[in-house]
């Protein structure tokens, strides 16, 4: 008969395979998958499972990372982003909508698909940047915007996007924004994701 693990060993295994457990894992490659042989967990993110919205967003972030990451690639930046985003979801200082927008913008930037928000896409000017075009993948100055379809955004929203794109992941969640900036940021990311990320994330069915 097949030997069964003891209840204590089973409890350890369950804790190590908690969906939000972060730590160091030792694995060996089986025929069709990797098998965990040892784990040293630093953070279980237990608070996430107590909040349905936070948990559904955390699952979305993990699903997003799984979609973008490639096996045997160096995906440390995405892993760092997941970790910091989970921490932000547990912090009541940050709205979940802001955490989602920050995660999405940083994740697509890590993947090389982020927008250009530091200079006009047409004339390369760095002043009077106020018009964002999803289809063109970036920002335009007031003069060049006359020939482009898109939306006007505030300086504060542009600064926020520049900060998210350029700041190391470890310092990413260190700010809050006004309702107006959050509204614009959410609108941009909703349209940008719909245009560039062609995937139906199942976990979003809960959070919306």
Task: Please provide the spans of the model-predicted regions.
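Generic beta-strand structural signal
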Residues: 21-23, 63, 128
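A short, structural micro-pattern
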Residues: 17-19, 33, 135
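Internal, conserved structured core segments that host functional sites
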Residues: 50-110
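Flexible glycine-rich surface loops and low-complexity tracts that mediate binding to linear polymers
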Residues: 20-32
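Single conserved hydrophobic/aromatic residue that forms the stacking wall/gate
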Residues: 1-5, 9, 13
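OB-fold/S1-family single-stranded nucleic acid-binding modules
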Residues: 33-44
